[in-house]
């Protein structure tokens, strides 16, 4: 019984996350139960809670992963991060960068941005994790309403920080 | 717009006819007193809630053609009633506006529609976000000026674009039960002809999913009898640009958003998957009412209203089956919607004038009613 209890406690932090999902050029651990689509609107991965069991989460929480090539003679992580900030601001209003954290994930440098902005009729908060994967940059973004974002910060941050490079496939279109 | 909601009994006491209500295009449900006031005429039957609106697009040239369509719409609204208008993008050619005080606000909006005293809800088009005459869509900041004009002190108050994408319900009175919910979509970032699609400055890869999520959620939550999305870019069109996924024949060489595939994906995942009633759009400069297609739930009807100023010939008039279509002539649509019917009239100008009969009544080129 004691052994089982110890095992359960050890597994508890992992239980909030499903198995690692491997996509085209990346892998990531999604929050448990989240459903994903690959390739819609050219986006390598879109994921969110299932509509049937969490309608509010389905309508508010969203994780995307993008994979973008980089000419490393011209672009470093810092430069790419600036481009990403510009890209988010381009489509947004009332744009604020709340935090920028340098990270190292299994030996690869990364930047974690915390953003707040308005897009369309919605106010959004976002974690944007940009990972230097050699000849490309991987970006995991999770967005939600500010209230839901604050409530789920730990889960969202764990998800984006689980982003890792993987082998690439040929381009679909 | 401040609209008049006067109970019919009050009008009767004042000796005014109930006809005044329909003439001003009011759509609010009207309650009658249960006990008639002595000495007053018999109660008029309860009015059926009704919404009337016009749809026009690709208009913003500030030229004779735009002025003529503006005058024709004002004439029609005076005769048949309009609660508001929707504009399907390319509100300012060729490269949008550069501020909320740009002179085009007067020449291509306020003056052409000076006699159209109703709110106008515009969508953004590729030329509204452009730096070059081709309307490449690489300057979203210009579109943001159109959002800002909604609350600008210089505006007449007609312009209603609270955000790049948003929703509103009609009747416009917040107290009324919605008959229609409109979803105003920002298609341009998902269908732009960018000089360098790989340039992350214009990256739609996050904007697309968040707009899709909002649209799906709003569509799912809608309690309106009818759902209507409007945008600049088509899902299908027999005009020069063609169908999304192969805009301008770019489907053979797909790069980024040029062929409109990301925009098609958004529509497939939302409007088509969830059974939207109508999609109204522009981009091509003609008038079309297209039949539902199997690739989009075989139910959604597609209405192209892009003949608000300069016009063009069809690209391939047989590409998609149409109920009716008209090229090479200015025009617009007028709609009347109740809880059970959605009627649209295509008005085509002749010699830049609204076509009317001998009695001065408007003569639509085509009329179609969809019932529920």
Predicted regions and their residues:
Chain B
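Bacterial N-terminal signal peptides that target proteins for export
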Residues: 1-12
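C-terminal motif of bacterial Sec signal peptides marking the signal peptidase cleavage site
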Residues: 20-23
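Bacterial signal peptide processing site
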Residues: 25-27
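N-terminal active-site segment of His-dependent metallophosphoesterases
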Residues: 32-103
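Structured segments of extracytoplasmic/periplasmic soluble domains
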Residues: 56-62, 72-79, 108, 112-115, ...
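Active-site glycine-centered loops adjacent to acidic/histidine catalytic or metal-binding residues
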Residues: 58, 89-90, 125-126, 185, ...
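Extended active-site neighborhood of metal-dependent phosphoesterases/phosphodiesterases
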Residues: 93-227, 241-262, 266-267, 275-278, ...
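A short C-terminal boundary segment appended to hydrolase-like catalytic domains
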Residues: 322-372
């Amino acid at each position: 019984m004691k052994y089982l209890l110890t095992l359960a406690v050890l597994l508890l932090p992992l239980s909030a996350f499903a198995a690692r999902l491997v996509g085209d050029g990346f892998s990531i651990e999604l929050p448990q139960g989240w459903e994903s689509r690959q390739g819609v609107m050219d986006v390598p991965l879109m994921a969110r809670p299932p509509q049937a069991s969490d309608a509010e989460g389905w309508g508010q929480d969203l994780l995307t992963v993008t994979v973008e090539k980089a000419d490393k003679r011209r672009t470093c992580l810092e430069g790419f991060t600036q481009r990403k900030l510009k890209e988010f601001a381009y489509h947004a209003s009332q744009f604020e960068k709340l935090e920028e954290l340098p990270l190292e994930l299994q030996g690869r440098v990364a930047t974690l941005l915390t953003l707040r902005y308005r897009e369309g009729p919605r106010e959004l908060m976002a974690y944007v994790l940009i990972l230097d994967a050699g000849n490309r940059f991987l970006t995991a973004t999770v967005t939600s309403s500010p209230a839901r974002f604050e409530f789920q910060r730990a889960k969202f941050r764990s998800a984006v920080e689980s982003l890792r490079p993987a082998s690439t496939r040929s381009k679909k279109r | 717009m401040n609209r008049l909601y006067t109970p019919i009994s009050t009008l009767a006491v004042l000796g005014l006819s109930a006809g005044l209500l329909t003439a001003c295009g009011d759509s609010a449900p009207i309650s009658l007193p249960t006990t008639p006031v002595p000495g007053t005429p018999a109660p008029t039957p309860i009015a059926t809630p009704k919404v009337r609106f016009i749809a026009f697009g690709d208009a913003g040239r500030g030229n004779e053609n735009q002025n003529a369509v503006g005058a024709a719409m004002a004439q029609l609204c005076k005769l048949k009633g309009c609660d508001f208008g929707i504009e399907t993008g390319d509100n300012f050619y060729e490269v949008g506006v550069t501020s909320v005080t740009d002179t085009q606000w007067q020449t291509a909006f306020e003056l052409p529609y000076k006699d159209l005293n109703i709110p106008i809800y515009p969508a953004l088009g590729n030329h509204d976000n452009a730096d070059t005459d081709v309307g490449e869509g690489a300057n979203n900041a210009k579109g943001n000026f159109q959002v800002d004009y909604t609350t600008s002190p210089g505006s007449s108050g007609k312009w209603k674009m609270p955000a790049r994408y948003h929703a509103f319900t009609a009747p416009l009175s917040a107290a009324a039960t919605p008959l229609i919910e409109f979803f105003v979509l920002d298609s341009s970032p998902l269908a732009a002809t960018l000089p360098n699609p790989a340039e992350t400055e214009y990256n739609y890869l996050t904007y697309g999913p968040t707009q899709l999520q909002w649209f799906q959620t709003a569509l799912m939550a809608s309690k309106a009898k009818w759902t209507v999305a409007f945008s600049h870019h088509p899902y299908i069109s027999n005009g020069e640009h063609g169908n999304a996924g192969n805009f301008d024949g770019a489907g053979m060489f797909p790069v980024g958003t040029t062929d409109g595939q990301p925009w098609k994906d958004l529509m497939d995942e939302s409007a088509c998957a969830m059974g939207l009633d109508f999609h109204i759009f522009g981009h091509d400069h003609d008038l079309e009412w297209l039949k539902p297609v199997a690739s989009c739930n075989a139910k959604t009807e597609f209405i192209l209203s892009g003949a608000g100023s300069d016009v063009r010939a069809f690209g391939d008039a047989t590409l998609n089956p149409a109920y009716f279509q008209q090229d090479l002539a200015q025009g617009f649509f007028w709609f009347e919607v109740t809880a059970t019917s959605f009627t649209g009239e295509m008005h085509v100008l002749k010699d830049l004038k609204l076509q009317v009969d001998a009695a001065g009544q408007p003569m639509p080129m085509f009329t179609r009613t969809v019932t529920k």
